[in-house]
Amino acid sequence: NPSGKLPDTFANSFADYPSSAHFFDSFFEVKYYEDIYVGYRYFETIPDAYDKVCYPFGFGLSYTTFDIAYKGVTEKEKGFTFEVAVKNTGAVAGKEVVQIYFNAPDGKLGKAKMSLVSFGKTKLLAPGEEEILTLDVEKYYMASYDDFGKVAKSAYILEKGDYTFYVGNSVRCNKEAFVYTLNEDKIVKQLEERCIPRLLEKRLTSDGSFEDVPTFEGPLYNYPSFPTIKQVFNGKETDKKYMLSDVAEGKVTAEDFVTQLSLEQLKSIVGGQPNAGVSNTFGIGNVEEFGIPNMLTADGPAGIRIKPKHNVLTTCWPCSTLQAATFNTPLVEECAEIGATEAEENNMAIWLAPGMNIHRTPMCGRNFEYYSEDPYLTGKTASAFIRGTQKRNVAATPKHFCCNNKEFDRMFCNSILSERALREIYLKGFEIAVYDSNPRCLMTSYNIMNEERAAENSSLITGILRGEWGYDGLVMTDWHNRGRHNREVKAGSDVKMPEGLPRQLGDDVDALRAAALNIVKLALYFE
């Protein structure tokens, strides 16, 4: 009995999606005029868009019927816990997905009329059987980002007013369950302005009109300085040479360990390393003198891809979009663990998965690698995949960070969007994954984003990913990107794949050691 739900909105035609109007305007740039109104957020909010939907987000069929009943809610410091009873009222056993949406007050900041904020799936229910699901909602994921300063500039805020929650099994099949009233505006998280566009003249608002966008006229590629790692060994021969195993045993710190590496070794380690065994996507690390292994990679996410003609078979899993359609995170986690087991069996340390960009348009050539048009579903599904992968001795690598929504001329296309859309839609899934599952690796995207290459963007990598989210894992580039290696290292990227460009690297030892330190920390993960 099928129990999946649509992770995307199926409109009547391609022209009905807001992204279609300007998708083919230019080979070299795409302007995200629709802003936060992506997928169902557009069709449920914008006037005259409602009737353009053929099948709504969250819709799914079953051979049985279910009664979904809201039972109550408990408010907690950081959110709410809902209890929902689901009863099989038909004649066939089946599973049902409960989806919780909320409607925020359309105050100074425009809001989508419906936003997914929690979901859960029942076990297989026999006819007449009932199950009570407990679903958590986090207030942080209800907040809107104020890039204009209408309430509090550069902050996630909850505007005063009524927040109405709906419980059901799709964005259009639900009932009002609970109203939370906020008597005054609340700053949920104060941040800094980052990744501001320079070339975006307008964006869509909730009433279907357009407004100006905050833009930036400052310098490109404004790189931070890295903290100096105290020189201990000067990269020279000493009476005592420390190995990676000594770091694992606590005999020396990782920071002191990397100071043994010469400038030439630092320039080498920040690039990809040769293939070995059945790997065909190269390795990371590989400084034999100090016991740093060559950590081999395997492409994904639909299974472990290895070098052909080696008579080694691996499982081909359903594509990411189908996995998201299960709305079943324990199942996704289980599948990922099995896939990671195959990686482990073939001496692969790093699985280049999951893919988790947003389905902004049906025309994106890699939508099959990505989960959904919705950032919350994307983030929670990816988190499950990462947890499953890292249950084994394998590092997950969520990708492509970020705004990779067009394959044609993907190396040079500039995704131009507001900071609000970037944070609420295109980064939110990655943020959830970092907070929920702590992936050991992360891959940047090919594209340019607001006039800076993703892999060279210090505001994105050092500012948001590492600074705001506290990410301490390894950041690698996508394969054969067109970024300059020296800029990538200065931006906070650790490894250029599949190989480095040492001639582009100068003698910024602090930046090189910072990258090497993250590579060493990854190697320690496998010790």
Mark where each language-model region is.
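Short beta-strand elements
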Residues: 173-192
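Glycoside hydrolase catalytic-domain context in secreted enzymes
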Residues: 1-173, 193-527
